[in-house]
Amino acid sequence: MIERSGNLIVISGPSGVGKSTLVKQARLELPYLEFSVSCTTRQPRAGEVNGKDYFFLTPEEFEAKVQNNEFLEYAGVFAHRYGTLKSEVVSRLQRGADVILDIDVQGAKQIRQAAAADPEIARAAQFIMIVPPDMATLEARLAGRNSETPESLKLRLAGAQEELSNFRVYDYLVVNDDLETAGKELIMLLKTVRMRTSTVIGEPFA
């Protein structure tokens, strides 16, 4: 029997592109997909469980992990910090799970840097960006939410354009013009990277 180590699936895409819906569909189809549990310095919300939803850390604990180089990537979001632990990802990869990291471009660049220094991350990391067919489509989707003011819509579009300008950081683009088609393409892509020879453990035919 062929045994496989997992892939680290880095997925990014601007707000309104349908990324969360596509990832949810893929997880329903592919049982070996998992999210890693991130660290955060924010307080737990009602019903959240430490170690399941997040690892809840004090700012001092978080900074200690930064100094000890324990994060694959980390960032500040408003007044709080979030990060992905190397140990959390590697343990899942070693038992054969494909680990999804839903992060922004800056986080993806940090993973690229980590891969340059770590052969296991370099082997495992696959970078996918979910993109709209064009900016006009994205603007229409964001406006259709009826949750944006003209000013906030303008800011979101500027942020999206900046994010999309970094598309060459990624290995693959999935264009979400039609949700059903994009969902099938993402699932096909995830199945394909699962079949890479670099995921095979040892010499199964020896």
Predicted regions and their residues:
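Conserved glycine(s) of the Walker
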Residues: 13, 18
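N-terminal phosphate/diphosphate-binding loop that engages ATP/GTP or pyrophosphate donors
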Residues: 21-70
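Extreme N-terminal, non-catalytic leader segments
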Residues: 1-8
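NTP-dependent small-molecule kinase module
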Residues: 2, 140, 147-148, 162-206
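ATP-dependent NMP and nucleoside kinases share a basic, alpha-helical "lid"
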Residues: 63, 67-70, 84-146, 190
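Flexible beta-alpha connector loops of hexameric P-loop NTPases
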Residues: 72-79, 145-151
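Short glycine-/polar-rich loops that comprise or flank the Walker A/P-loop
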Residues: 6, 31, 121-126, 168-170
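Short aromatic/basic micro-patch
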Residues: 55-57, 83, 102, 173
